[in-house]
Amino acid sequence: MTNIRKSHPLFKIINDSLIDLPAPSSISSWWNFGSLLGIWLAIQILTGLFLAMHYTSDTTTAFQSVTHICRDVNYGWILRYLHANGASMFFICLFLHVGRGLYYGSYIYKETWNVGVILLFAVMATAFMGYVLPWGQMSFWGATVITNLLSAIPYIGTDLVEWIWGGFSVDKATLTRFFAFHFLFPFIISALVVVHLLFFHETGSNNPTGIPSDSDMIPFHPYYTIKDMLGALVMILALLMLVLFSPDLLGDPDNYIPANPLNTPSHIKPEWYFLFAYAILRSIPNKLGGVLALVLSILILALMPLLHTSKQRSMMFRPLSQCMFWLVVADFLTLTWIGGQPVEHPFIIIGQLASILYFLLILVLMPMMSIVENRLLKW
């Protein structure tokens, strides 16, 4: 008699995805982040669901409802901070997951990679809308500034912005629809994750060497289930440390001031995980140019399969490309820092140089270094 997990239509899918899945024997801890992202998504949906039970998406009561959650709801404070800081952990894992893909050439699996890029956009849109919901000063002005960027689109821009706002400014209609979309999007993300995994299981996993590993596969369970559980334990511990010791470390103090359309904060900035794109946006004096650069800073990932000029897949044995990759990482961190600084000298020029370097490295220098390495190896 065959095992039920191998014969039952539903269990068979789970078995082929998590238990009997053939996995390369050499994949390192950099491959943990996919499963971690799944865990974070589940945590975000659960905490978000319980928060939504007590939240009201009305401009007059939104701020008070968040206060009520923190003060009056049993363990409401921990739900709120798990959700807010869980988003930060989500993005840390997301950036590391993308970085791993860039370093080890995972973008060669085009379908999986492109669904991943769509997922990144969807998660960023969800996080942005979630940041508006507490209806603090930074929520209101962040929403105003970022949505207003769409007015840079020629001809339809102004109409588009007013259509998104549901009026002539960010107001009750905007908050209500942002709450509706913020609730809906995680389920769309979950569906996209299934598509992402579907394409991923068509090709199998890449490995650090970038060499096909069909001849050296091991079952996912117990080897990688245990390994993923360790990664999850470490990250959940980090999240709990953040939530229980310094829950407001990554937030903005201005968001504890109720939204006031008549009083602009001295320095409007989004959450830390958008700062790199925000810095690129600010570094271009032209509004439309800034918006295009903002979108391209993430959309550039979709070009990675086209920009791959090396005869090797992974960067493991390519020291020149490694230097370029770590320059991109350093540049990303520099942009994140600049995005949080006021618009004044010397931050303006640093931001502009870092933005130019970001596109130059990815579009020109990395493909060039790959060609140089090919020549050095006489390929």
Swiss-Prot record:
A ubiquinone binds at residue 201. InterPro entries: Cyt_b/b6_C (IPR005798), Cyt_b/b6_C_sf (IPR036150), Cyt_b/b6_N (IPR005797), Cytb/b6-like_sf (IPR027387), Cytochrome_b (IPR030689), Cytochrome_b_C_euk/bac (IPR048260), Cytochrome_b_N_euk/bac (IPR048259), Di-haem_cyt_TM (IPR016174). Binds 2 heme b groups non-covalently. Its main location: mitochondrion. It comes from the Eukaryota. It is found in: Mitochondrion inner membrane. Gene3D superfamilies: Cytochrome Bc1 Complex, Chain C. Keywords: Electron transport, Heme, Iron, Membrane, Metal-binding, Mitochondrion, Mitochondrion inner membrane, Respiratory chain, Transmembrane, Transmembrane helix, Transport, Ubiquinone. It is a multi-pass membrane protein. GO terms for cellular component: mitochondrial inner membrane; respiratory chain complex III. The keyword Manganese does not apply. Heme b b566 binds at residues 97, 196. PROSITE patterns: CYTB_CTER (PS51003), CYTB_NTER (PS51002). One of its GO terms (molecular function) is ubiquinol-cytochrome-c reductase activity. GO terms for biological process: mitochondrial electron transport, ubiquinol to cytochrome c. Its cofactor is heme b. Heme b b562 binds at residues 83, 182. The chain crosses the membrane at residues 33-53, 77-98, 113-133, 178-198, 226-246, 288-308, 320-340, 347-367. The keyword GTP-binding does not apply. Belongs to the cytochrome b family. Component of the ubiquinol-cytochrome c reductase complex (complex III or cytochrome b-c1 complex) that is part of the mitochondrial respiratory chain. The b-c1 complex mediates electron transfer from ubiquinol to cytochrome c. Contributes to the generation of a proton gradient across the mitochondrial membrane that is then used for ATP synthesis. The cytochrome bc1 complex contains 11 subunits: 3 respiratory subunits (MT-CYB, CYC1 and UQCRFS1), 2 core proteins (UQCRC1 and UQCRC2) and 6 low-molecular weight proteins (UQCRH/QCR6, UQCRB/QCR7, UQCRQ/QCR8, UQCR10/QCR9, UQCR11/QCR10 and a cleavage product of UQCRFS1). This cytochrome bc1 complex then forms a dimer. Heme 1 (or BL or b562) is low-potential and absorbs at about 562 nm, and heme 2 (or BH or b566) is high-potential and absorbs at about 566 nm. This is Cytochrome b. The gene is MT-CYB.
